[in-house]
Amino acid sequence: MELLKALLLLSGVFGALAEFCVIPRIDSQLVEKLGQRLLPWMDRLSSEQLNPSVFVGLRLSSMQAGTKEDLYLHSLKIHYQQCLLRSTSSDDNSSCQPKLSGGSLALYLLALRANCEFFGSRKGDRLISQLKWFLEDEKKAIGHNHEGHPNTNYYQYGLSILALCVHQKRLHDSVVGKLLYAVEHDYFTYQGHVSVDTEAMAGLALTCLERFNFNSDLRPRITMAIETVREKILKSQAPEGYFGNIYSTPLALQMLMTSPASGVGLGTACIKAGTSLLLSLQDGAFQNPLMISQLLPILNHKTYLDLIFPDCQASRVMLVPAVEDPVHISEVISVTLKVASALSPYEQTFFVFAGSSLEDVLKLAQDGGGFTYGTQASLSGPYLTSVLGKDAGDREYWQLLRAPDTPLLQGIADYKPQDGETIELRLVRW
């Protein structure tokens, strides 16, 4: 009895000191609508549209898609295994290169863990080796004195470390050290703004390493870096409640949910963030499958670290397709497209149906002549690679802005311009 009293006393003391990140419960119908938006994407099985994050998000949610999930994972396995085989032959594997490096391969490894799969075959060893080679190449690009940059970005670097850690694969201290150095020296700040999703991904990766006590010689730095990431995320909270922006908030919450903290207002911050997410869900802000897949876990009080010991027998509600709303005749709106950072400045107004995407506007402009653009597929949707014949160079990208200077938070396939808006495409460095 005395021991029980002592334990209760200790739990009371620690409970008073440490706060947990918990968000308010979201209405189950709103959550179900999110899951329903993923169902059509699970029917898209082409190599360009397969997205491991969709599978991971659904497996960490409170919902399931039945046989669709099995078929989707089967399609993922076939595609990645074929790409892996081609990478060792002389076949043209240009379409596979993005799949076998960085974020995409890391997400595929997370998808396998979400299905409770452990690596015990040569194919598994080759996948692990492929991702380790990617990190080695990125480490070399960063350089011994940290004067360079990853060939991709630190988000993919952190995600790759996380995926390997979840599979309980160790990495050399020098690889982990690059991520630690980046956290310690504010490398995730671009144009004066903290990249919250990059901070969060680094925090998740480092927390995984800490839990396994990997890279024990770096333990003090890892612990300090996790605290630094948490502090930066909390400081990034806007008055509206989100961290950075509404789309970086789910990953930020995943990181904050991984461990309690004291004296930083963690509980209050997470409640505010959860409230902002609720409002955004009611407004229909989450349409992109990648963003939805990052949001679903936290609505089920899960994070990517739950993939360390996944529960593949957990009861999940079966999703049914949403009933489509009757088609209404849309009004016609005007949208002006502007490009200033080009040899020949461009500005033209187009008339499109309300609800059209920015990509629809770009296609209309190109079909009309005098305007050209190029895109590349990614897990978050197509992104601009060239405008009016001008390709984005090294450490450059085509930024989307609502005039005069408001950056868009969505990509060309997701953003729906409003009547009278001017959308500027601006080439910027990062």
Swiss-Prot record:
- Keywords carried by this UniProt record: Cobalt, Cobalt transport, Disulfide bond, Ion transport, Metal-binding, Secreted, Signal, Transport
Pfam families on file: Cobalamin_bind (PF01122)
Please name the InterPro entries in this protein's record. Answer: Cbl-bd_prot, Cobalamin_Transport
- Cite a GO CC annotation: extracellular space
Q: Which domain of life is it from?
A: Eukaryota
Bridged cysteine pairs (disulfide):
21-270, 116-312, 165-208
Which positions carry the signal peptide feature in this UniProt record? 1-18
Where on this chain does cob(II)alamin bind?
152-156, 193-197, 245, 248, 294, 398-400
Q: Where in or outside the cell?
A: Secreted
An MF annotation (GO) of this entry: cobalamin binding
- GO terms for biological process? cobalamin transport; cobalt ion transport
Q: What is its main location?
A: secreted
Query: Which family is it part of?
Result: Belongs to the eukaryotic cobalamin transport proteins family.
Q: How does it assemble?
A: Interacts with CD320 (via LDL-receptor class A domains).
Q: What PANTHER family is this protein classified in?
A: TRANSCOBALAMIN-1/GASTRIC INTRINSIC FACTOR, TRANSCOBALAMIN-2
Q: What does this protein do?
A: Primary vitamin B12-binding and transport protein. Delivers cobalamin to cells.
Official protein name in the record: Transcobalamin-2
Query: Which species?
Result: Mus musculus (Mouse)
